[in-house]
From Swiss-Prot:
GO terms for molecular function: isocitrate dehydrogenase (NADP+) activity; magnesium ion binding; NAD binding. InterPro entries: IsoCit/isopropylmalate_DH_CS, Isocitrate_DH_NADP_dimer_prok, IsoPropMal-DH-like_dom. Its EC number is 1.1.1.42. The record marks Y169, K239 as: Critical for catalysis. Binds 1 Mg(2+) or Mn(2+) ion per subunit. NADP(+) binds at T114, H348, G349, T350, A351, P352, K353, Y354, N361, Y400, R404. It comes from the Bacteria. Its cofactor is Mg(2+); Mn(2+). It comes from Helicobacter pylori (strain J99 / ATCC 700824). Keywords: Glyoxylate bypass, Magnesium, Manganese, Metal-binding, NADP, Oxidoreductase, Tricarboxylic acid cycle. Mg(2+) binds at D316. This is Isocitrate dehydrogenase [NADP]. It holds the Pfam family Iso_dh.
Length: 425
């Protein structure tokens, strides 16, 4: 289907990324929609574009180039389109044209988004993922030489597949004292004979959906990633010891899928199993771990874990805990994916007190752009960004968050850090 925006202008140049036989086909001048983001978005996104354009130019000598196409969500969207009466209040923050563009052009990148204040407004990040069914939140975590609170951060090299569409993030909950909460509690107590609600008169209630289909499509992606990237293991992280029919089912369905679709064989008496990587012949172990024990293990034995598949809430905790071990969320990249669309993003917040000061670390969105280039098959440009990031940090010309933790560092601005990276390509 053609892209026919109602409010935005169509891109003036560039070509569309398409999908043929399940594979991404990327032209030499692809249109990439970008959302600048709120708060520090106006600092970090231009820095990212500068770094990406330089890496692409250096890698391909002008044969390839990105046609950047700005689309809008968040505060900037609201300020720009609040007088458009044909838009609902939600659409003034989350423009329908933007969703259509992200779906149509297949690959996009975004800065951090503020959540509108007021009843009925959800997190815009969550709304974007849910509207487009971007069911995988992909978070690679590795060390680039930045200051770290742990002794051996180089041992951390994990990729988290966090389920994006289910769990308590589905937002199915009711406030304490509301008619809906009272009705649901009454139903649970009287129809289902639930006796475990300790304070029924003053409880808010939420529902945690975990489905077989949602689990299978996430686990399938995680195992495919392990095969494609020659990883030694996939670990299901869950609290199935407590939540047997949701998180326990996630583990059970995960093992069943590995056996059914990837011919994984049970080790000893299970439940761990192993499969042979069809591309390399190496063994991939499929295992699981209780979430609280896993949070200990990533500190004590991080090198034993590689690809992680988990649900929404666990994935949120784990990805931020791992990010802290390698330099913090300011440098943590991420992406939201489904079978056809990839939306790459800065994983931190809008930090409004630093907005417009040209101060903060643009590392998260730059490394998310590196993921984006790799996803597009532009591996040479992606490799340039990784090596430039490592060299820039090693040179100790870094933004304030790293400079205060490094002896002999020279503090540079956000835009200057981008220039330091370009000098190191």
């Amino acid at each position: 289907m053609a892209y026919n925006p109602k409010i935005l202008q169509k891109p003036k140049e560039g070509e569309e990324i398409t999908i043929k036989d399940g594979k991404l086909h990327v032209p030499n001048y692809p249109i990439i929609p970008f959302i600048e983001g709120d708060g520090i978005g106006s600092d970090i996104t231009p820095a990212m574009i500068k770094v990406v354009d330089s890496a692409v130019q250096k890698a391909y000598k002008g044969e390839k180039k990105i046609a950047w196409y700005e689309v809008f969500v968040g505060e900037k969207c609201y300020q720009k389109f609040k007088d458009h009466k044909e838009l609902s209040p939600e659409e003034q923050w989350l423009l329908p044209d933007t969703i259509e563009a992200i779906n149509h052009y297949k690959v996009s990148i975004k800065g951090p988004l503020t959540t509108p204040i007021g009843e009925g407004f959800r997190s815009l990040n969550v709304a974007l993922r849910q509207k487009m069914d971007l069911y995988v939140c992909l978070r690679p975590v590795r060390w680039y030489g930045s200051p770290s609170p742990v002794k051996e951060p180089q041992k951390v090299d994990m990729v988290i597949f966090r389920e994006n569409s289910e769990d308590i993030y589905a937002g199915i909950e009711w406030q304490e004292g509301s008619a809906e909460a009272k009705k649901l509690i009454h139903f649970l107590q009287n129809e289902l004979k639930v006796e475990k609600i300790r304070f029924p008169e003053s409880s808010g209630v939420g529902i945690k959906p975990i489905s077989k289909e949602g689990t299978e499509r996430l686990v399938r992606k995680a195992i495919e990633y392990a095969i494609d990237n020659d990883k030694p293991s996939v670990t299901f992280v869950h609290k199935g010891n407590i939540m047997k029919y949701t998180e326990g089912a996630f583990m059970k369905w995960g093992y069943a899928l590995a056996q059914k679709e990837f011919n994984a064989q049970v080790i000893d008496k299970g439940p761990w199993c192993s499969l042979k990587n069809p591309k390399t012949g190496k063994e991939i172990i499929i295992k699981d771990m209780i979430a609280d024990a896993f949070l200990q293990q990533i500190l004590l034995r991080p090198s034993e874990y590689s690809v992680i598949a988990t649900m929404n809430l666990n994935g949120d905790y784990i990805s931020d805990a791992l990010a802290a071990m390698v330099g913090g969320i300011g440098i943590a990249p991420g992406a939201n994916l489904n079978d056809t669309v990839g939306m790459f993003e800065a994983t931190h917040g809008t930090a409004p007190k630093y907005a417009g000061l040209d101060k903060v670390n643009p590392g998260s969105i730059i490394l998310s752009a590196e993921m984006m280039l790799r996803h597009m098959g532009w591996v040479e440009a992606a490799d340039l960004i990784v090596s430039a990031m490592e060299k820039a940090i090693k040179s100790k010309k870094v933004t304030y968050d790293f400079a205060r933790l490094m002896d002999g560092a020279k503090e540079v601005k956000c835009s200057e850090f981008a220039s330091v990276m370009i000098e190191n390509m």
